[in-house]
Amino acid sequence: MFDLPTVAPLDMEDSWVTFQAEGDQGQDSFSSSVNLDDSLTSLQWLQEFSILNANVGKTPSSSGDSHGYRHLSGAPCSPLAADPACLGMPHTPGKPISSSTSRASHLGLQPMEEIDYKTNPHVKPPYSYATLICMAMQASKKTKITLSAIYKWITDNFCYFRHADPTWQNSIRHNLSLNKCFIKVPREKDEPGKGGFWKIDPQYADRLMNGAMKKRRLPPVQIHPAFASAQAAASSNGNRASAWQMSVNSESHKLLKEFEEITSEQSWNALGEHGWNAISDGKSHKRKQPLPKRMFKAPRLSSSPMLSQEEQTELGSLKGDFDWEVIFDSSINGVNFSAFEDLEVTPPLSPVSRSVDLTVHGKHIDCPQQWYPMGQDQAVAQNSLDFDETFLATSFLQHPWEENRNDYLSNSANIEQLFDLNDAFPAELNDWPALGSYI
């Protein structure tokens, strides 16, 4: 029977003790690193990492690993330790760096000037479309360039656009149309070819080359010089017209206010001096100086002692049949006819034809001489001032005593003009029966 050696359990026990001690040490270091930063993106392990401590090619010793156990210290601490590209790079403890900084430093290893865009079809030029257009225009050394020439220059100098999708040409056209830095020049009639030309605005050339104008912007509203001058003239004319209108309105308002004050004073004076005129014709004072516009109506006031207060109220509108004899007989006492000598008979505003038949109770009355117009021009001028009053006066003269007519006597009848009170009324009461011949 084969006897097992007694040293084997001792070697296994020593190996297990060594493995357990190393495992506890690794757990302590891991817990300490976790306590520093719990983030998943923590790079704290880079501070303790050194490629000199990583024994990639170290094999386990025969004494310590006779049963196939491996020491944890021989494993690499990071994936970079097993990367052959990292073997020649020095790894020393330092501050952690971010991934973006690593990429920036990696890209910095390849300078932009070393890339040949003319032959490299995989790298897109780091220029905006507006900058490419500006570069093509400046390279042509011409004041204007066609769209096809811009395409040709870009494809000749940048290999990327020769192999890329041709949709970039749409972007070139959009930039030419929408960017205010480029101006379209129409083709002359005698120039061969088709299509227009494009040129760059000189004030934006430097900014384009510096990369400041990389966004599309709407072109500004450009007004033709002819339209601009017409607009300026129209605005100046409008300002003058508005100023003139304001001055005219202010002057008209001032004159109208003064005229209303004068007219109102004359109206009150006329009402106070001639109470009979206020009863017979409430608008007689307006016929002497008519307003250009009917702004207000004078109140019909009466200070005549012939009528009482109740009769004055009822006399506002004389409707129905009435008798002049009853009116004169009821109010004949206490009348001072000396006031009629100062009255003036106002001729009507409209010309009165001689064929007008003025008949009262079958007796014909001739028209006064003052009623006939002095001239056609004067009649036309007076007619245009107050048409409604002229119409009332004319209609009354044509139909003096129409039966069953419900009109306001104070608006249509003028007793002074009808009876010629200046000559007909006697100065004394003894001659009053002579008035009966008119009735």
From Swiss-Prot:
Gene Ontology biological-process entries: ciliary basal body-plasma membrane docking; cilium assembly; regulation of DNA-templated transcription; regulation of transcription by RNA polymerase II
Subcellular location: Nucleus
Matches recorded under CDD domains: FH_FOXJ1 (cd20023)
Protein name: Forkhead box protein J1-B
Coiled coil: none
Entry GO CC: axoneme; nucleus
Family statement drawn from the similarity comment of this UniProt entry: Belongs to the FOXJ1 family.
GO molecular function (one): RNA polymerase II cis-regulatory region sequence-specific DNA binding
Protein species of origin: Xenopus laevis
Function: Key transcription factor required for motile ciliogenesis. Activates genes essential for motile cilia formation and function.
InterPro entries: FH_FOXJ1, Fork_head_dom, FOXJ1, TF_fork_head_CS_1, TF_fork_head_CS_2, WH-like_DNA-bd_sf, WH_DNA-bd_sf
Residues in the DNA-binding region annotation: 124-218
Keywords from the UniProt entry: Activator, Cilium biogenesis/degradation, DNA-binding, Nucleus, Transcription, Transcription regulation
Main subcellular location of this protein, as a coarse class: nucleus
